[in-house]
Amino acid sequence: DVIETKGGIKTQHNVLEQIGINTRELYGFKVVEPLASLLKWQVREVARYLKIPSSIAERQPFPGPGLSIRTVGEVRRDKLATLKMATKITEKHLSKYKPSQYFAAIIDNKKKVPYPDVNGIAKIAAEKLNISPDQVSIKVFADRATGIRGKARVYGDILAIKSTGEDGGIIRREIKHLLDLQRAILQDRRDFTHLLYMIAERGIDKPYVIVIRAVETRDFLTAEVSDLPWESLEETAYEIMEECRDVSEVYYDVTPKPPATIEME
């Protein structure tokens, strides 16, 4: 938290004195932080040494501002309620794989139009996925999310890709191939910070889109995308759409950190 806030990558609610905020003058108290110099994995080591139950010591991080940080764009009561349900379902299905962090995020189902060079992006995607450009659908969301460029925080567009077979169904992809796809696009298109690949869709427009995020990391300063079985992602997506009737599509975020941040904000 301290490293990323001082570096301008994130604004953490719990980082104060390290960025020049005098809590004694402003609030009348001094913050005592015996673990402030430790990274997350080191805090876990301390917890294990103190014999704190693993249900506490090993649980995944949760942002101080709560689910609002995973609510991209405007925060509304119904939107948060949908995200709570999607989060519960995501954690239920993915906990057995023990990713370092795994959660759901929610985006308003609104496109940024017109968007330049959509055909060019579709062509790159088709080449990497070994299909015709006609089998690729591109969506750029109106809301944006945080990323990292040159060790600094940036806001960038969220790119979503769907590929379909001859029967019109979504093509299953190995995660490693989707990682190759995001590298091919994001290394040249610095206006994007997150690349999403569609897992499932309802077929009719609804207000929201859910993004499943799962990463592997030791220090949370960098992170790799979790290589999860496609069947589990599908099961998660189908249950989300069954329980969340206002969700139109479900995607998997296949962007490592960097260029994305782990959270959407």
Regions found by a protein language model. Name each.
Residues 1-265:
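ATP/NTP-dependent adenylation/nucleotidyl-transfer catalytic domains that generate, transfer
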